[in-house]
Structures are given as structure tokens and as C-alpha cells.
Curated annotation (Swiss-Prot):
A carbohydrate binds at Y67, Y89, Y116, F117, D186. Keywords: Carbohydrate metabolism, Endoplasmic reticulum, Glycoprotein, Membrane, Signal, Transmembrane, Transmembrane helix. Residues 204-247 are annotated as: Disordered. Glycans are attached at N252. GO terms for biological process: protein N-linked glycosylation. This is Malectin-A. Residues 27-253 are lumenal. It comes from Xenopus laevis. The lineage of its organism: Eukaryota, Metazoa, Chordata, Craniata, Vertebrata. It is found in: Endoplasmic reticulum membrane. Residues 216-226 have a biased composition (Acidic residues).
């Protein structure tokens, strides 16, 4: 009779082979994250295993707000809504310094949700990374609406002492400076942020937003309709009716008539004079 160990040994090997990648993916994602902060809030471990530390700017720069704690956040996992419900803002520009020891490919993820204003053009600001503007005129409400999660995903490359982001290059000295820049409308803010090794494809996506997807589809349809109408207008312009006659062509014949009359009078007159 086969022993239990003999039977279960190969079975365990098969299970580890099949399930191993799934477990490795979850832990692998958290291992790629080198720095994460829950801005304006306490420490938190999300559903992907990413450990967000308590905000290091507490009591130093800006103000923490938990105003969003009373609101459900769309597009976010229920367990991770706290990452969008708390925030840090400041009446002037502010930011975080992130130490990076190794060169390579990185992704900076910035998390936002508008939990106060209920219309666009109320809070608009920029985001800079080491002096490079990576997000211009961010209007969270205009992007996704009220109490809805929004992530900005920014790939970064650090090689041979140079930082490359969105086509711009600068010298890198081991510190990534993420700055939220005050604009003309209210104060800059952030709900949470992290940086990880890898590419944008490695970043977990937010849940779909039916209303947002419908809006994007409508905008795409409008762009296509606009392009089609322009082509039709151009086509109609090519065949817009018969050509207008050239007015100068008729003027040539009218000029020739007096000349011919003059010749007709001059020749008989000359003939008569010669006979005299």
C-alpha cells in the first residue's frame, strides 16, 4: 500500500507549480514598491500588500484632512478607500523627497479624489518631479467627478546619473523630489503616493467607472464625427459648381475691335492719298 507521503508528495508539487505564480505575483508587487505614504493619514496595507507609511509631513508642512472619511470613494476597493479619503494640502507648493539608491526603471503613482468641490475649475494645480512638470493643470473633478478615485501614473528612468521623465532629462543625485505646485485655483493636494520598480503595466488599475467610460466614448465619437464632417466639407469644396468665367478673357476681344476699325479706315485713306 502506498504511503500518504508518497501520494501527497507529487500532488503538493503540482499544486505549488500551478498556484505558485499567483502567490508570487501578489507578494512580488509589494516587493517592487520602495516607498509609499498615505498622505494626511495613518499607515495602511492595501489589498496588493503595499505598505503605506504614516505621513512623514505631519506637523511639519501643510494640513492633513480626513473630510473624505464620510464619503464612499468610487473606483476604489472598499478596503483601500482610506487611501483616497484622507489627504494633505497646503496653501503653497509642497512635496515629498524620496531616496532612490539604485538605477533602473521606476513608476511613480499619485492618488487623488475630490471630496470637497462639486464642480470643475475650483482646484487646479501642477505636479513636478525634480523640476519637470509631469502633470499640468490637474483638475480632479473635471477628470473623474466627485468622490471618485483618480491615479496619475508616471514612468521614470534613472540611468548613468540621469533622470528621464516624459521626454526630459536632468542630473540625478539620489533623491526624487515630488512637488505639488500651487496654481490659480485653491490649494494643491495629494491623497497617497508610492514609487515602485517596473513599468506602468505593473501598476494595479482602478475599478472601471461606467460614467467615465461613457464620457470618453462620447468624446471619441465627437472627434470622429468632426473629422468626417471636415473631410466632407473639403470634398464639397472641390466640386462646388462650374468655374466662374475669367472676366479678363472677354476684355481682350473688346480691345481688338477698335484696332481693327482703325486699320479699316487707315488703309482706304492711304490708298486715296497715294492716287493723288
Amino acid at each position: 500500500m502506498l504511503s500518504i507521503r508518497t501520494v501527497l508528495g507529487p500532488l503538493a508539487t503540482i499544486l505549488l507549480t500551478v498556484l505558485g505564480p499567483f502567490g508570487a505575483h501578489g507578494s512580488g508587487l509589494a516587493d517592487k514598491v520602495i516607498w509609499a505614504v498615505n498622505a494626511g493619514g495613518e499607515s495602511h496595507v492595501d489589498v496588493h500588500g503595499i505598505h503605506y507609511r504614516k505621513d512623514p509631513l505631519e506637523g511639519r508642512v501643510g494640513r492633513a484632512s480626513d473630510y473624505g472619511m464620510k464619503l464612499p470613494i468610487l473606483r476604489s476597493n472598499p478596503e483601500d478607500q482610506v487611501l483616497y479619503q484622507t489627504e494633505r494640502y497646503n496653501e503653497d507648493s509642497f512635496g515629498y523627497d524620496i531616496p532612490i539608491k539604485e538605477e533602473g526603471e521606476y513608476v511613480l503613482v499619485l492618488k487623488f479624489a475630490e471630496v470637497y468641490f462639486a464642480q470643475s475649475q475650483q482646484k487646479v494645480f501642477d505636479v513636478r518631479v525634480n523640476g519637470h512638470t509631469v502633470v499640468k493643470d490637474l483638475d480632479i473633478f473635471d477628470r473623474v467627478g466627485h468622490s471618485t478615485a483618480h491615479d496619475e501614473i508616471i514612468p521614470i528612468s534613472i540611468k548613468k546619473g540621469k533622470l528621464s521623465v516624459q521626454g526630459e532629462v536632468s542630473t540625478f543625485t539620489g533623491k526624487l523630489s515630488v512637488e505639488f505646485v500651487k496654481g490659480y485655483y485653491d490649494n494643491p493636494k495629494v491623497c497617497a503616493l508610492f514609487i515602485m520598480k517596473g513599468t506602468a503595466d505593473d501598476v494595479p488599475m482602478l475599478q472601471p467607472h461606467p460614467g467615465l467610460e461613457k464620457k470618453e466614448e462620447e468624446e471619441e465619437e465627437e472627434e470622429e464625427e468632426g473629422s468626417t464632417s471636415k473631410k466632407q466639407i473639403n470634398k464639397n469644396r472641390v466640386q462646388s459648381g462650374p468655374r466662374t468665367p475669367n472676366p479678363y478673357a472677354s476684355d481682350n476681344s473688346s480691345l481688338m475691335f477698335p484696332i481693327l476699325v482703325a486699320f479699316g479706315v487707315f488703309i482706304p485713306t492711304l490708298f486715296c492719298l497715294c492716287r493723288l
